[in-house]
């Protein structure tokens, strides 16, 4: 597949995952039984992990193809995304927190970490949607 097609496919995959993630926030959690609420919250964080992975990989491909920079890690990809002017410093800081929190969630289950990360999920959702908008506007043709 040509690079532009590969990039569009990665962005589309990210968009689809992010749409599913966003849908999990459309319901009033107070209406559900605590067991159901817990299951939904776990699903939200699982989709958060998946979306954050797709996000940085799409960013890495963009940076490689358009800016001729080869980030070695998720943090490097986000740093170069910022250095190339795609995002502002506030978005950069939030994206670094997204990566840190994704790592916390994927390595151990700890209820305190779960609660801490969940408290930031609204802010993360906003920035992840901002990144999608940026990725959709950029072409690597």
Language model: regions and residue ranges:
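Solvent-exposed interaction patches of small proteins and small membrane subunits
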Residues: 1-141
